[in-house]
Amino acid sequence: TEKAKDQVRMAVAKAAKLEDLIPKSVPVERAAMVVGAGVGGMQAALDLASAGIKTYLIEATPTIGGRMSQLDKTFPTLDCSQCILTPKMVDVGRHPNIEMMTYTEVEKVEGYIGNFDITLRKKARGVLTPDEATAKGIVGGGCNGCGDCAEVCPVIKPNPFEMGMAPRKAIYIYHAQVMPLIYTVDFDSCVKCNLCVDACGDKKAIDLEMQDEFITVKVGTAILATGFDLIPIEGKREWGYKQFDNVISSLEFERLICASGPTGGH
């Protein structure tokens, strides 16, 4: 038909004016950011760092490890999850190309492919690391994970790592294998009685007036490994959760059967 002939002529005329597509190249920042420090995020960070790439490992909670650290055994070998996870956590903490930033969240992302400016919000932990203490001129100071502060803290709260089935203090660590081994102040619960400050003594690790900090890093790529959360099963009334004692969540079950859990695995 005449219409078909016109369409062919138009396509030929358009093709005659086409220009070659020339690939564009842009300089890429040789640094990477991994958001989420569960087992997936840690492995991604280790792979990048081992390839010689500076890597920022960002974790919103006070410790790396993610959900896997709450599990008892892993399929198919039934190995203890902590036995697999803890060496990897140590490798992350020791790797010279990994800058581990716990208790930190991504605030803003700007830039373009290969060149991103990431603004990070470093939440106030209330406790200085040894490096932070040294930077403030406190020789030999900073938290060493001794736990003296938690022993004297009068505030008792449910431990979210144990799914609320065990207590923790207002200054706390989730569990004994945390990385980094630095205590954190729950400012929503802290009554600022200063008992922890006195217990810390010459280490001067506790700063109850600490404020959030904003840090900007430049990276060429970002990996999102933010993991998962349980669905709010309280909304499913037909399941009987929180109505019957023998209805529990999968993570509560994991903590109950775990030898290091609140019931010692019983």
Q: Each predicted region: which residue ranges?
A:
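Rossmann-like dinucleotide-binding core of oxidoreductases
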Residues: 100, 253-254, 261-266
